[in-house]
Amino acid sequence: MIDLSPLVRRLAGTPLASWSQGLQAQLDAKLEKGHGDLDRWRGALEALPALQPSEVDLVNGLRLDCDCDDATRAQMRQALMGLSPWRKGPFDLFGVHVDTEWRSDWKWSRVGPHLDLKGKRVLDVGCGNGYYQWRMLGAGADMVVGVDPNWLFFCQFQAVQQYLPELPAWHLPFALEDLPANLEGFDTVFSMGVFYHRRSPIEHLLALKDCLVKGGELVLETLVIEGDENQVLVPEDRYAQMRNVWYLPSVPALARWLRRAGFSDVRCVDVSVTSVEEQRSTDWMRYQSLSDFLDPNDHSKTVEGLPAPRRATLLARK
């Protein structure tokens, strides 16, 4: 059982206090329903060696270390491998380098300098395995709640969290839709790599706005195309082999959508073409990756002949 009482205590006296009261029952109900692989992943978590980190670095990456022998490291590696595939990272855990599919540290180095998270209550929507949650704490956030309904990501978060039990980061296996309307309790809300999977993009923006306090900041990172405010790509079928991609707006179009959704002070702080060095197959994620989804003769296009992945980060104020 995962005990959420520290989260409830943390949220006492905040606008999120009443929401927090029902979280334990909501989580227990989700765990009761479970997932077919949950027992196997729990076995991997139980196989992790009991270690106490003497070094913790969440500022320059995600690194935990202490004195431990090769046998303990081998045990650590085997247990973590049992939670593959690892998508977001990398993690350096007691001498084991988890070389994830994504170099998420590169994205954080592009996004992080534009943010002031000091003392902020943060929500990370579609948080994956929680890599960015730890980096947000490293950037001074007061606390970070992540929501993502993927059970493997939930277990990967637990693998790191069991070595950092005192830190104010929580991963809830919920979708954004599981959060109540008009929550209005977070200073900063992140939606990174989620927007293009949504069939109703404006509804997603409104739901994110609902989570923010008045004057709070949205950090929106998503796939975009080049063009003016009237340019939006809706793939006929797949995009980079993904079926569930709906809307790829231009940056000016996305900025307009944010303003229509009631946000102000909208600004784009980064646009980057995703490279095959930033997203690739590794020992920790052995399935196909970006190089398999691009035209082998022209990396400016996907295998479907559409513009290759280009990602933008926009900030906006409620």
Curated annotation (Swiss-Prot):
- Name one molecular function that GO assigns to this entry: methyltransferase activity
The record ties this protein, via Gene3D superfamilies, to:
Vaccinia Virus protein VP39 (3.40.50.150)
- Swiss-Prot/TrEMBL GO biological process terms: tRNA wobble uridine modification
Q: Which UniProt keywords apply?
A: Transferase, tRNA processing
Q: Which CDD domains match?
A: AdoMet_MTases
Q: What is its EC number?
A: 2.5.1.-
Please give the catalytic activity noted in the UniProt record.
carboxy-S-adenosyl-L-methionine + 5-hydroxyuridine(34) in tRNA = 5-carboxymethoxyuridine(34) in tRNA + S-adenosyl-L-homocysteine + H(+)
Summary of subunit composition and partner proteins: Homotetramer.
Protein name listed in UniProt? tRNA U34 carboxymethyltransferase
Q: In which organism is this protein found?
A: Pseudomonas putida (strain ATCC 700007 / DSM 6899 / JCM 31910 / BCRC 17059 / LMG 24140 / F1)
Which lineage?
A: Bacteria, Pseudomonadati, Pseudomonadota, Gammaproteobacteria, Pseudomonadales
Gene assigned in the entry: cmoB
